[in-house]
Amino acid sequence: MAEKKIFGYADKISVKPGDDISFYVHADGTDVVDAQLVRLIHGDAHPAGPGYKEEEIANEANGVWRVRKQFTQVGSFLTVADPEQRLALSGSFSLCTFVHANSPGGGRRQCLLGRWDAFGNRGYGLWLNPDGFLEFGFGDGGEVDYLDAEVPVLKNNWYFVAATFDAKTGVATLYQEGVATRYNSLLSKVANVDFRSHVRETLRFRPVNPPEIPFLLAGARDHHTLRGDFVTQCLNGKLDRPSVFDRVLTRAELDSYRDGGVPPQDGLLAFWDTTQGYTEHGIGDEVIDAGPYGLHAIGYNRPVRAQTGFNWQGRDDCFRLAPQQYGGIEFHDDAIIDCKWELTRSIKVPDVRSGAYAFRLRTGDAKGMREEYVVFFVRPLKPKAPILFLVPTGSYLAYANEHLSFDAEIMQPLAGQSPILSEVDIELYQTAEFGLSLYDHHADGAGVCYSTYRRPILNMRPKARMSSMGVTWQFPADLSIIAWLDHMGYDYEVMTDEDVHREGIDALKPYNVVLSGTHPEYVSEPILDATEDYIGAGGRFIYLGGNGYYWNVGYHSEDPWCMEVRKLNSGMRAWQARPGEYYLATTGQKSGLWKDLGRPPQKLFGVGFISEGFDSARPFRRMPDSWHRRASWIMEGIEGEIIGDFGLAQGAAGGIEIDRYDLTLGTPPHSLIVASSGGHSDNYQTVVEEVLYPYPGLSGSHDYRVRADMVYFTAPNDGAVFSTGSIAFSQSLPYRNFDNNVSRLLGNVVTAFSKPGKLPGWAWTAEEKQWR
């Protein structure tokens, strides 16, 4: 019998009581699981804390669920709507496209375009063959006839390729020409390589084109007895302006098409103009057929738009300025946006308190892959509590199913330790159906720019630890804040990034104070705007993280579960977007760091990212500002000057990723530094965006800037901000069952911030700082 494994996901990440939510579960080795609704309280099993905590919730859906093996279509491609079967060609024809191959060869066949049935060897197609050569062929249901180019297609270079077939004579031709400009390809004209190939051959028979075979771009249909039809031979690379004709194009016509990107009109059946559809706010998944029949194509697993095309000239770096140069649409054979599993169970969300919830699924011994938590967050029907915990779900998506311990060569020196792998980590790495994170590369080397929660996310579970660092990260780390709020008896509610992105400041207005998560790194402009407007209008914000509000991301307007980022020329980044591909297809905005867009987090929270180190953490020490009459109340009940020389994340409150006060980047000038960390190891390096020239001394034991600053300042209309500047801070809260000076300090701030009216120390707000 197969080893028992269960994995699942939900169709929503944020719900209210009374909402419907659906669950999708995959199982190997069993057809039943035991399901239990639980409220998640604390997610870190570290022995220095209270341990893992959950609360079982009575619900009619508790009990045995029937489950089954599920199948996932991996890889992005385009499906053409062809109801009248105009592309089921029976006579002469031509296939044309511009192509930029990311990883030709390598033993993989990649279909550029065609109507090919890989299971039955029927239809026709234009491929990159397993050796990386352009190939045209067709099948009659038994045999397949192929025609191959003479020279291979080189990776990351633009080509114009075409195949023609004369039904009267049986003659097929292949046309392959390089179309590199000074900007668009890896190689320039000085490289002494042969891009050109023109071959001609008489094929033995005619293709068979059954009506049920779909016309696909960047893939071909296949079939399996258990899963049915699916798409295989997915392309790794870009296509631009592909087309189909019902006649043989001449060499002169192909040359003209190659030079200008405009196809001849005579005999044109379809011309997918990949430059059409751009707006000020991006572009969707539909690719317009500008030919006579409107055979439009729709993307599956979100082929990447807003990519440079064959004719990109380097002058304009945004599709809004030169859409005709942005015909590139990029495909990856390991892309996933939505697993589209069959439904396992739907429920109506019960009338429960706001918080973090999951259906806990178990089979067998309920260890490792025999236990699954399908997590979601419950908002209140109407806000009532004074305190909101803003769940940074965008950042959860960014790290979802990351492969850093396996694929990132720098991870061990960066972390300063060897990874500690579990069987779940290994299963995640070996299973393509779980997809990738925004810290990974596709198999072809391109950075991953999309992430989604319509798939199992194995590290968005309680108890999960980041294998490369040995600490909880993102969601399970944020449960330390929820556990603290619970333990302290505060009246609080939760909401997600997705909610604030959609509703803006109206989502935050009802609350006296908003608490962030430990690492709210990825935020959209609506989230950033709402946070700034909330504070400016008198709201109070407690920033409990490090490296927060760092990357500008976009959410797909119709698919809120899908988030996009482009990583540009600055910032601590796992990959680098290609030149000209810096703008988000989902919003039309330039991505990258908010700092580089004029909105560094210092302007909002008083602190911003300065360093990271994963080998150790350091305590905070009180700074002179902490005795100022404006801020001394924050330290009430705290003895001595050292704060947080303990914790569940590397043993102290200041560390992992840390932020500092910086007036040159917009820290409000009246901000008070109430405490700072120091003495960090040399594993803590100054972040690259703060370095113009590298030089010896940019590390924790040398650079005075490498520190976490705890900052407090007041804002208009009785608003205020308190920032910890450290990811590790909140993971010190549970130490010794929440009886510690970090817990006491945060309690002082939350209690004061959550009460209406003036803050302690308000009478001295206009007083100058006594220390600089």
Label every model-predicted segment.
Residues 8, 13-32, 40-308:
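Extracellular glycan-associated modules
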Residues 23, 163, 340-353:
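Short, hydrophobic beta-strand segments
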Residues 30, 40, 302-336, 366-507, ...:
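Aromatic-Pro/Gly-enriched surface loop or interdomain linker
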Residues 60-77, 325-345:
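Aromatic sugar-binding surface patches on proteins
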Residues 68-69, 355-361:
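Short, aromatic- and glycine-rich surface loops/edge beta-strands on solvent-exposed regions
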Residues 123-127, 483, 707-715:
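Short, surface-exposed beta-strand/loop micro-motifs that present aromatic residues
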Residues 334-335, 344-347, 352, 470-557, ...:
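Helical hinge/lid and interdomain linker segments adjacent to catalytic or ligand-binding clefts
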Residues 559-737, 741-748, 752-753:
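Glycine-rich, aromatic-lined ligand/substrate-binding cores of catalytic
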